[in-house]
Curated annotation (Swiss-Prot):
InterPro entries: Fork_head_dom, FOX_domain-containing, TF_fork_head_CS_2, WH-like_DNA-bd_sf, WH_DNA-bd_sf. Residues 118-218 bind DNA. The keyword Nucleus applies. SMART domains: FH (SM00339). GO terms for biological process: anatomical structure morphogenesis; cell differentiation; regulation of transcription by RNA polymerase II. This is Forkhead box protein fkh-4. Keywords: DNA-binding, Nucleus, Transcription.
Length: 421
C-alpha cells in the first residue's frame, strides 16, 4: 500500500493517469452534454450548481483523447434552453464535488451475463425482506433498490423495469402501510415516504411463497443466510455508496465494491470522476454472505451535503491519528476483492471489541490480515489486534484470528495468508 499525499486533490481533467484504468473508464466526447440519470432524484441527493459542462472548451481533455469513444450527439435527447434549463441544472452534479457519474449510455458492463436468470423470488418478498432489515422496519423505495442490488447480482444487469414492480408492491397497500416524513427540517416543502410492512412477525407466513423457500434452499449462500434476513440480522447496505455509485452504475453494486469504496474513503482517498479501477463486476456468483451488519441512520443527503469529503466522519478513519493519504496498487485491489471475506472478518472482530471505527479497519490491519503481509505493527493499530498478536505468539497461532473464513467452500475467499502458506 502506498502513501499518496500528492495525488488526492486534482482538477477534473487530471483524474486519469495513463495505463491505470480499466475499460470501464469511459466518458463524454468533447461536445457531449452529460447528465445524471433520473434515478438519483429519489435520493434527494442532487446539488444545484451552475450549468457548466466540465468538459466544455475548444480543446478536448487528455482523458478524451486517450480513452474515450465518440458519442454521437444526434442520438441523445437534449432539453431546450429557457424554462427547461433549471431541470437540467438540477442533474448536473451529485454529492461530493469530486464524485460524479457519467450517463449510462457511455458506461457499459463488460461481463458476459448471458447465463444470468432472474431469481424466482417474488417482488413482494424482496420488499418485505428489505423492510425487515431496515431501521425501525421502515424503508424508502430507494432503500429497497439498494438492498436488491446488493444481494442479487441479476438485478445489476436487468432492465430497470423491476423497480416499477417494487414501487407497485410498496404502494399497493395490501401488504405495506405508508408514512410520510420530512428529510430536511429546514425545507418543509420536501416530503418523502417510508413504507412499513404490515404484520412484520408474519412475513414468512404471509409474504413468502413455497417457490421462494425453494429458491432460498438452492441459493449458494444457504438457507442460513435467508434465516438471518428473516430475523433482520443482515441490515441495509450503507447508503452513501449506493447514492453515489451503486444505483448510478448498478453493475458495480454489491458488498465487495461497497467495502472498497468506504475503505478508500477511510484512507483519505476520494474516488474521482469515473475512477473505477478500484471496482469489479462480481457476476460469476453471489457474494459470500460474510458482511457484518451496519447500523446506519437514514441518510439525509440534500442540497446541503458537504462539498468536500473531509467533512464526512469516515474520511481518514483508517489512518487514525497518524493521518496520511494512502492508495491501493493494482495488485492490492485484486487482493482486496479476492479476499473480501477476511476483510469482513476483521470488521467483525473490531466490532465485537466496540472499536469506534470498526467499519473501516486501519491501514495496518488491511496490510496484515487481508493482504497477508508481515509488516511491523503500526502505532495506530487497534488494541484488540495488538492483543491478538501477543496471544497468537503464546498459543502458536499465526495471524489468523478470523476462523470463520475457513468455513467457505469458495477458493476465491481463502485468505491470502493461507494461500501463501
Amino acid at each position: 500500500m502506498q502513501s499518496n499525499d500528492e495525488n488526492i486533490y486534482f482538477p477534473a481533467n487530471q483524474y486519469v493517469n495513463a495505463g491505470q484504468y480499466s475499460p470501464l473508464q469511459q466518458s463524454f466526447s468533447q461536445n457531449s452534454q452529460y447528465d445524471l440519470f433520473d434515478g438519483f432524484a429519489e435520493f434527494g441527493f442532487l446539488e444545484q450548481v451552475p450549468a457548466t459542462n466540465m468538459y466544455s472548451g475548444s480543446q478536448s481533455t487528455q482523458m478524451e483523447q486517450n480513452y474515450l469513444p465518440n458519442v454521437n450527439n444526434s442520438t441523445r435527447k437534449r432539453k431546450a434552453p429557457g424554462q427547461n434549463e433549471q431541470a437540467t441544472v438540477k442533474r448536473r452534479q451529485i454529492g461530493i464535488e469530486k464524485w460524479r457519474l457519467p450517463s449510462r449510455s457511455v458506461v457499459q458492463p463488460s461481463a458476459d451475463i448471458s447465463d444470468l436468470r432472474r431469481p424466482p423470488i417474488s417482488y413482494v418478498a424482496l420488499c418485505a425482506l428489505a423492510c425487515r432489515n431496515a431501521p425501525d422496519m421502515k424503508i424508502t423505495p430507494a432503500g429497497v433498490y439498494a438492498f436488491v442490488l446488493h444481494h442479487w447480482r441479476y438485478y445489476r444487469y436487468a432492465n430497470e423495469n423491476w423497480k416499477n414492480s417494487v414501487r407497485h408492491q410498496l404502494s399497493s397497500k395490501e401488504h405495506f402501510d405508508e408514512e410520510t416524513f420530512q428529510p430536511d427540517p429546514s425545507n418543509p416543502t420536501v416530503r418523502r415516504k417510508f413504507y412499513i410492512v404490515k404484520n412484520p412477525n408474519m412475513i414468512r407466513q404471509n409474504l413468502i411463497s413455497d417457490a421462494d423457500f425453494d429458491f432460498f434452499r438452492k441459493d449458494s449462500r444457504g438457507i442460513e443466510f435467508y434465516q438471518k434476513m428473516f430475523a433482520g440480522q443482515i441490515g441495509l447496505p450503507r447508503s452513501l455508496f449506493y447514492q453515489i455509485i451503486g444505483n448510478g452504475i448498478p453493475f458495480l453494486a454489491g458488498p465487495e465494491n461497497s467495502s472498497m469504496f468506504y475503505q478508500l474513503l477511510g484512507m483519505g482517498k476520494v474516488v474521482g470522476y469515473l475512477e473505477t479501477r478500484y471496482f469489479r463486476e462480481h457476476y460469476r456468483s453471489e457474494h459470500a454472505a460474510t458482511e457484518p451488519k451496519y447500523e446506519e441512520d437514514y441518510a439525509n443527503f440534500t442540497e446541503k451535503i458537504p462539498s468536500n469529503a473531509e467533512n464526512l466522519m469516515s474520511y481518514g478513519a483508517a489512518t487514525e491519528r497518524n493521518f496520511q493519504k494512502f492508495d491501493f496498487t493494482d495488485e492490492e485491489i485484486e487482493l482486496f476483492h479476492l479476499n473480501i471475506s477476511s476483510y469482513h472478518s476483521v470488521q467483525k472482530t473490531c466490532k465485537e471489541c466496540n472499536l469506534p471505527n470498526w467499519c473501516t479497519p486501519s491501514v495496518g490491519d488491511v496490510e496484515t490480515y487481508v493482504f497477508g503481509r508481515q509488516v511491523p505493527m503500526p502505532v495506530n493499530t487497534p488494541v484488540i489486534l495488538q492483543q491478538f498478536e501477543t496471544v497468537a505468539e503464546q498459543e502458536g497461532i499465526r495471524n489468523n484470528p478470523l476462523e470463520e473464513r475457513k468455513t467457505t467452500e469458495d477458493p476465491r475467499d481463502i485468505s491470502i495468508l493461507e494461500a501463501l502458506a
